[in-house]
Protein backbone atom coordinates (compact mmCIF):
# COMPACT_ATOMS: atom_id res chain seq x y z
CA UNK A 1 0.00 0.00 0.00
CA UNK A 2 1.12 3.51 -0.78
CA UNK A 3 0.42 4.67 2.77
CA UNK A 4 3.15 2.50 4.25
CA UNK A 5 5.50 3.36 1.39
CA UNK A 6 4.97 7.09 1.82
CA UNK A 7 5.46 6.98 5.60
CA UNK A 8 8.75 5.14 5.11
CA UNK A 9 9.87 7.69 2.53
CA UNK A 10 8.91 10.59 4.80
CA UNK A 11 11.36 9.26 7.38
CA UNK A 12 14.08 9.00 4.75
CA UNK A 13 13.35 12.47 3.39
CA UNK A 14 13.57 14.18 6.75
CA UNK A 15 16.71 12.21 7.62
CA UNK A 16 18.26 13.66 4.47
CA UNK A 17 17.38 17.14 5.67
CA UNK A 18 19.50 16.86 8.79
CA UNK A 19 22.33 15.05 6.99
CA UNK A 20 22.60 17.34 3.98
CA UNK A 21 21.57 20.84 5.01
CA UNK A 22 24.61 22.99 5.82
CA UNK A 23 24.58 25.53 8.61
CA UNK A 24 22.39 28.33 7.26
CA UNK A 25 24.33 31.52 6.62
CA UNK A 26 22.23 32.72 3.69
CA UNK A 27 18.48 32.95 3.32
CA UNK A 28 15.92 31.17 1.25
CA UNK A 29 16.03 33.12 -2.04
CA UNK A 30 15.91 36.57 -0.41
CA UNK A 31 16.86 36.91 3.24
CA UNK A 32 15.01 38.58 6.09
CA UNK A 33 15.04 42.38 5.96
CA UNK A 34 16.74 42.56 2.56
CA UNK A 35 13.84 44.14 0.63
CA UNK A 36 12.60 47.72 1.09
CA UNK A 37 9.20 48.00 2.79
CA UNK A 38 7.32 49.01 -0.37
CA UNK A 39 8.44 45.82 -2.13
CA UNK A 40 7.59 43.70 0.90
CA UNK A 41 4.02 45.02 0.76
CA UNK A 42 3.84 44.74 -3.04
CA UNK A 43 4.85 41.07 -3.20
CA UNK A 44 2.59 40.20 -0.26
CA UNK A 45 -0.41 41.69 -2.09
CA UNK A 46 0.47 40.06 -5.42
CA UNK A 47 0.89 36.63 -3.83
CA UNK A 48 -2.20 36.68 -1.59
CA UNK A 49 -4.83 35.82 -4.28
CA UNK A 50 -2.87 32.73 -5.36
CA UNK A 51 -2.69 31.52 -1.75
CA UNK A 52 -6.41 32.07 -1.21
CA UNK A 53 -7.39 30.12 -4.34
CA UNK A 54 -4.85 27.45 -3.44
CA UNK A 55 -6.30 26.90 0.04
CA UNK A 56 -9.78 26.40 -1.42
CA UNK A 57 -8.50 23.82 -3.90
CA UNK A 58 -6.33 22.15 -1.26
CA UNK A 59 -9.32 21.61 1.02
CA UNK A 60 -11.22 20.05 -1.87
CA UNK A 61 -8.29 17.84 -2.91
CA UNK A 62 -7.71 16.58 0.63
CA UNK A 63 -11.10 14.83 0.55
CA UNK A 64 -10.34 12.87 -2.66
CA UNK A 65 -9.68 9.34 -1.51
CA UNK A 66 -7.78 7.79 1.41
CA UNK A 67 -4.33 8.58 0.07
CA UNK A 68 -4.95 12.25 -0.74
CA UNK A 69 -3.47 13.72 2.42
CA UNK A 70 -0.43 11.44 2.25
CA UNK A 71 0.21 12.36 -1.38
CA UNK A 72 -0.09 16.05 -0.53
CA UNK A 73 2.28 15.56 2.39
CA UNK A 74 4.72 13.71 0.15
CA UNK A 75 4.67 16.54 -2.39
CA UNK A 76 5.21 19.06 0.40
CA UNK A 77 8.09 17.05 1.86
CA UNK A 78 9.67 16.85 -1.60
CA UNK A 79 9.58 20.66 -1.83
CA UNK A 80 10.92 21.02 1.71
CA UNK A 81 13.90 18.74 1.19
CA UNK A 82 14.97 19.99 -2.22
CA UNK A 83 14.56 23.67 -1.39
CA UNK A 84 16.61 23.21 1.79
CA UNK A 85 19.74 22.14 -0.12
CA UNK A 86 21.46 25.49 -0.60
CA UNK A 87 24.50 26.85 -2.42
CA UNK A 88 25.78 30.43 -1.86
CA UNK A 89 25.04 32.78 -4.77
CA UNK A 90 24.07 36.46 -5.02
CA UNK A 91 24.53 38.53 -1.86
CA UNK A 92 21.29 38.33 0.10
CA UNK A 93 20.22 35.15 -1.66
CA UNK A 94 21.28 31.60 -2.55
CA UNK A 95 20.76 28.86 -5.12
CA UNK A 96 18.96 25.57 -4.59
CA UNK A 97 16.43 23.27 -6.26
CA UNK A 98 12.79 24.16 -5.67
CA UNK A 99 10.99 20.81 -5.79
CA UNK A 100 7.74 22.44 -6.91
CA UNK A 101 7.57 20.82 -10.34
CA UNK A 102 6.35 17.48 -8.98
CA UNK A 103 3.51 19.04 -7.00
CA UNK A 104 2.51 21.25 -9.94
CA UNK A 105 2.23 18.21 -12.21
CA UNK A 106 0.28 16.15 -9.66
CA UNK A 107 -1.98 18.82 -8.12
CA UNK A 108 -1.76 21.94 -10.27
CA UNK A 109 -0.09 25.30 -9.62
CA UNK A 110 -2.47 26.74 -7.01
CA UNK A 111 -2.22 23.87 -4.54
CA UNK A 112 1.54 23.95 -5.10
CA UNK A 113 1.49 27.63 -4.09
CA UNK A 114 0.04 26.67 -0.70
CA UNK A 115 2.52 23.82 -0.21
CA UNK A 116 5.42 26.11 -1.09
CA UNK A 117 4.06 28.84 1.18
CA UNK A 118 3.87 26.43 4.13
CA UNK A 119 7.39 25.18 3.41
CA UNK A 120 8.74 28.74 3.34
CA UNK A 121 7.11 29.54 6.68
CA UNK A 122 8.64 26.47 8.33
CA UNK A 123 12.07 27.20 6.86
CA UNK A 124 11.94 30.84 7.93
CA UNK A 125 10.90 30.02 11.50
CA UNK A 126 12.78 26.77 12.13
CA UNK A 127 15.84 26.88 9.87
CA UNK A 128 16.48 30.63 9.57
CA UNK A 129 16.16 30.35 5.79
CA UNK A 130 14.43 33.38 4.33
CA UNK A 131 12.19 35.43 6.55
CA UNK A 132 8.71 36.72 7.23
CA UNK A 133 9.29 40.11 5.60
CA UNK A 134 10.39 38.44 2.35
CA UNK A 135 7.79 35.65 2.52
CA UNK A 136 5.60 37.21 -0.16
CA UNK A 137 8.47 37.72 -2.60
CA UNK A 138 9.90 34.26 -2.01
CA UNK A 139 6.49 32.63 -2.30
CA UNK A 140 5.80 34.41 -5.58
CA UNK A 141 9.08 33.33 -7.18
CA UNK A 142 9.21 29.74 -5.91
CA UNK A 143 5.58 28.80 -5.33
CA UNK A 144 3.66 30.91 -7.87
CA UNK A 145 5.79 31.67 -10.94
CA UNK A 146 7.74 28.40 -10.98
CA UNK A 147 4.72 26.07 -10.60
CA UNK A 148 2.67 28.02 -13.16
CA UNK A 149 5.42 27.58 -15.74
CA UNK A 150 6.04 23.93 -14.80
CA UNK A 151 2.33 23.11 -15.06
CA UNK A 152 1.90 24.99 -18.34
CA UNK A 153 4.95 23.37 -19.94
CA UNK A 154 3.92 19.89 -18.83
CA UNK A 155 0.32 20.20 -20.02
CA UNK A 156 1.39 21.77 -23.30
CA UNK A 157 3.90 19.03 -24.07
CA UNK A 158 1.41 16.31 -23.11
CA UNK A 159 -1.21 17.74 -25.48
CA UNK A 160 1.45 17.80 -28.20
CA UNK A 161 2.06 14.08 -27.64
CA UNK A 162 5.59 14.51 -26.29
CA UNK A 163 7.11 11.67 -24.26
CA UNK A 164 5.94 11.82 -20.63
CA UNK A 165 9.41 11.56 -19.08
CA UNK A 166 10.75 14.39 -21.24
CA UNK A 167 7.68 16.50 -20.45
CA UNK A 168 8.21 16.03 -16.72
CA UNK A 169 11.94 16.75 -16.99
CA UNK A 170 11.49 19.94 -18.99
CA UNK A 171 8.61 21.16 -16.82
CA UNK A 172 10.56 20.73 -13.58
CA UNK A 173 13.75 22.20 -15.04
CA UNK A 174 12.08 25.28 -16.53
CA UNK A 175 9.98 25.80 -13.40
CA UNK A 176 13.21 25.90 -11.41
CA UNK A 177 14.92 28.31 -13.81
CA UNK A 178 11.92 30.65 -13.95
CA UNK A 179 11.98 30.86 -10.16
CA UNK A 180 15.45 32.37 -10.34
CA UNK A 181 14.61 34.64 -13.25
CA UNK A 182 11.78 36.06 -11.15
CA UNK A 183 14.06 36.33 -8.10
CA UNK A 184 16.59 38.23 -10.22
CA UNK A 185 13.88 40.65 -11.34
CA UNK A 186 12.72 41.09 -7.74
CA UNK A 187 16.25 41.95 -6.63
CA UNK A 188 16.72 44.28 -9.60
CA UNK A 189 13.46 46.10 -8.84
CA UNK A 190 14.58 46.62 -5.25
CA UNK A 191 18.15 47.58 -6.19
CA UNK A 192 18.11 48.80 -9.82
CA UNK A 193 21.38 50.71 -9.73
CA UNK A 194 21.87 52.74 -12.92
CA UNK A 195 19.75 50.37 -15.03
CA UNK A 196 16.96 47.98 -14.04
CA UNK A 197 17.59 45.81 -17.10
CA UNK A 198 21.35 45.55 -16.53
CA UNK A 199 20.82 44.89 -12.84
CA UNK A 200 18.44 42.00 -13.63
CA UNK A 201 20.91 40.59 -16.16
CA UNK A 202 23.68 40.78 -13.58
CA UNK A 203 21.68 38.83 -11.01
CA UNK A 204 20.62 36.26 -13.62
CA UNK A 205 24.21 35.78 -14.75
CA UNK A 206 25.45 35.10 -11.24
CA UNK A 207 22.55 32.75 -10.48
CA UNK A 208 23.11 30.86 -13.74
CA UNK A 209 26.51 29.56 -12.62
CA UNK A 210 24.90 27.36 -9.98
CA UNK A 211 21.26 27.21 -11.00
CA UNK A 212 21.48 25.66 -14.46
CA UNK A 213 23.18 22.45 -13.18
CA UNK A 214 20.75 22.37 -10.24
CA UNK A 215 17.74 22.76 -12.56
CA UNK A 216 18.91 19.87 -14.74
CA UNK A 217 19.43 17.71 -11.65
CA UNK A 218 15.98 18.62 -10.34
CA UNK A 219 14.41 17.67 -13.67
CA UNK A 220 16.01 14.23 -13.54
CA UNK A 221 15.06 13.67 -9.89
CA UNK A 222 11.46 14.72 -10.57
CA UNK A 223 11.18 12.17 -13.38
CA UNK A 224 12.55 9.42 -11.13
CA UNK A 225 10.21 10.34 -8.27
CA UNK A 226 7.16 10.56 -10.55
CA UNK A 227 7.89 7.15 -12.05
CA UNK A 228 8.48 5.74 -8.56
CA UNK A 229 5.04 6.93 -7.43
CA UNK A 230 3.38 5.54 -10.56
CA UNK A 231 4.33 2.00 -9.48
CA UNK A 232 1.97 2.12 -6.49
CA UNK A 233 -1.73 1.51 -7.02
CA UNK A 234 -3.05 4.08 -4.53
CA UNK A 235 -0.79 6.78 -5.97
CA UNK A 236 -1.93 6.21 -9.55
CA UNK A 237 -5.04 8.33 -9.01
CA UNK A 238 -2.90 11.48 -8.82
CA UNK A 239 -0.28 10.33 -11.30
CA UNK A 240 -2.94 9.59 -13.91
CA UNK A 241 -4.68 12.86 -13.10
CA UNK A 242 -1.46 14.68 -13.93
CA UNK A 243 -1.34 12.95 -17.31
CA UNK A 244 -4.71 14.29 -18.45
UniProtKB/Swiss-Prot annotation:
Any single Pfam family the record assigns to this protein: CbiM
Keywords, sorted A to Z: Cell membrane, Cobalamin biosynthesis, Cobalt, Cobalt transport, Ion transport, Membrane, Signal, Transmembrane, Transmembrane helix, Transport
InterPro entries per record: CbiM, CbiM/NikMN
Protein origin, superkingdom: Bacteria
Signal sequence segment: 1-27
Keyword Signal recorded: yes
Gene Ontology molecular function terms on file: cobalt ion transmembrane transporter activity
Membrane topology recorded in Swiss-Prot or TrEMBL: Multi-pass membrane protein
GO cellular component, one term: ATP-binding cassette (ABC) transporter complex
Gene3D superfamilies: 1.10.1760.20
Keyword Transmembrane listed: yes
Gene Ontology BP annotations: cobalamin biosynthetic process
NCBIfam families in the cross-refs: cbiM, PRK08319.1
HAMAP family: CbiM (MF_01462)
Family: Belongs to the CbiM family.
Protein task: Part of the energy-coupling factor (ECF) transporter complex CbiMNOQ involved in cobalt import.
Subunit structure: Forms an energy-coupling factor (ECF) transporter complex composed of an ATP-binding protein (A component, CbiO), a transmembrane protein (T component, CbiQ) and 2 possible substrate-capture proteins (S components, CbiM and CbiN) of unknown stoichimetry.
Name this polypeptide is given: Cobalt transport protein CbiM
Protein species of origin: Carboxydothermus hydrogenoformans (strain ATCC BAA-161 / DSM 6008 / Z-2901)
